[in-house]
UniProtKB/Swiss-Prot annotation:
One of its GO terms (molecular function) is 6-phosphogluconolactonase activity. The gene is pgl. This is 6-phosphogluconolactonase. InterPro entries: 6-phosphogluconolactonase_DevB, Glc/Gal-6P_isomerase, NagB/RpiA_transferase-like, PGLS. Its EC number is 3.1.1.31.
Amino acid sequence: MNYISFPTAQHAVDKIAQEFVIYSQLNHPVHISLSGGSTPKLLFKTLAKSPYAEQINWKNLHFWWGDDRMVPPSDPESNYGEVQKLLFDHIQIPAENIHRIRGENEPHFELKRFEEELSAVIPNGVFDWIILGMGIDGHTASLFPHQTNFDDENLAVIAKHPESGQIRISKTAKLIEQAKRITYLVTGESKADILKEIQTTPAENLPYPAAKIKAKNGVTEWYLDKAAVRLL
């Protein structure tokens, strides 16, 4: 496991925010896929403030999501809604740079629409940077243990949360693995046990999508805080 340990979650988030500045200064569109969860909320709040809000050339950055729940943006469960509230409402970014999963739509209709948008905007399917989280069950995006098809050739998939039954749309494992760079942002003591397991056990012997999904031709890295690395 290629990991970097930071003293706190805020330190990890600041490093990511600094890299947003660098990506935004490239002279071409940069496609970044965001994650839901508590640590990304800290990232969005950080990006919305000085100095990052002013230093980032937002018009060069295109934002996507690894997954989202099939709820409207006004619902607190919406990953897109969180980013809108914490970041997009506070910056100047072109509307066409935001490529959300439309959770208010019927799932099968939205799956087709979202795949068509992906194909049109990123024809080669290669994201510049995909930021992912990991649940304590080892899921990432909405790809859950024992129900993920790692050979699915589609770009996105309808997924069901194994406990709540909540419907989501997620990028497929194969699409994620085409990225130039994948960063797992994982913080907190609750993740320490599973991180130890991932570090010490071959991925093929584990059921966790987060252990298996890696960039095929790019960089895969883990940004962890002190609490998460305590057993490594």
